[in-house]
Amino acid sequence: MLGGNGYVEESGLPRLYRQAPLNSIWEGSGNVIALDVLRAMGRSSDTLAAVTAEIELARGADPRFDDAVKRLHTELGEIEGLPFRARRVAGLLALCLQGSLLLRHAPSAVADVFCATRLGGDWGSVLGTLPAGTDAAKIVERASIRAV
């Protein structure tokens, strides 16, 4: 391994390393981050209340979203063993918040595909598994940078 030199020298390989996601190096493992989310929620009841209030604003907009929110409340209600489920709970919390924001602020085609691929069905943890009939052009259009 190149160690620190792999990030600072000017050959092509270090550039690839620099462009790779470094969150696990900078912020610690995913489990540490998930446990920190639980710690923040435990410090003040206002923290979780604020996030769940934001999530609840989209209730009723999509049945897959509603099911995910129900699962989230179930996970949060089962205090026993919560640290062992920290990654799952933090991930579901993030997905529900993303879903709420997309359902309220994104074009319906974008929100629908998010709910289908992240909140419902059997997508697993693999990105890029879109359902048949997805209007990919609308998603790409939404992500495109436009001159103002």
Write out the residue ranges for each language-model feature.
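Flavin-dependent oxidoreductase catalytic core characteristic
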Residues: M1-V148
